[in-house]
Amino acid sequence: MKIVLATGNAGKLAEMTRMLQGYDAEVVRQGHLGIDSPAETGLTFVENALIKARHCAERSGLPAVADDSGLAVPALGGEPGIYSARYAGSDAGDAANIERLLAELSERGQGDRRGTFHCVMVYLRHAADPAPVIAHGSWTGRIVETPRGHHGFGYDPVFEDPELGQTAAELDAPAKDARSHRGQALRALIQGIAAEVAG
């Protein structure tokens, strides 16, 4: 079964491909099919994931999986939230987004540094699927003051798992997959579509 992954993010593709090993599913990234990314006009992770999945399903004629994820920091009123990938501007990269996050927290003092990664995954069998499978995962930790680690992407270097005392960027792939918001969401999604991707 071929499924199009509605993302241009190579890190997300690598994580999903790794976690889908053993299932009868070939995951192809939208870019490999010449599909562009739609405008993310939703106000929630769920809305944006549906927009992305529907866009890819329409253009590819294939089932589509989309993920919308981000980091919510209570001390910042839930920011960066749905704007996590473009927190420092629409063309900003991971380093600039991390720099802005740390600056915003620094301005507010050293109080509450909790943060929660959220991931919503959506599976559409076709563009007009009236009953999409929707899964959510979350991972709560602490935002550290100095980036650590070289794995992962996004805010991983500043997101510390409280039980392990390591940032997401310090974890190897199996450890991260077992704990992460994306790992949780994908496992829940697979349960919801198990009959369709069973190996």
Curated annotation (Swiss-Prot):
Cofactor note: Binds 1 Mg(2+) ion per subunit.
Enzyme class: hydrolase
List of residues binding substrate: T7, G8, N9, A10, G11, K12, S69, F153, G154, Y155, D156, K176, H181, R182
An individual GO BP term: nucleotide metabolic process
CDD domains: HAM1
Keyword Electron transport among record annotations: no
InterPro entries: dITP/XTP_pyrophosphatase, ITPase-like_fam, RdgB/HAM1
Domain of life: Bacteria
Binding of Mg(2+), residues: D68
Reactions performed catalytically: XTP + H2O = XMP + diphosphate + H(+); dITP + H2O = dIMP + diphosphate + H(+); ITP + H2O = IMP + diphosphate + H(+)
Entry EC number(s): 3.6.1.66
Record-linked NCBIfam families: RdgB/HAM1 family non-canonical purine NTP pyrophosphatase
Assembly and binders: Homodimer.
Protein name: dITP/XTP pyrophosphatase
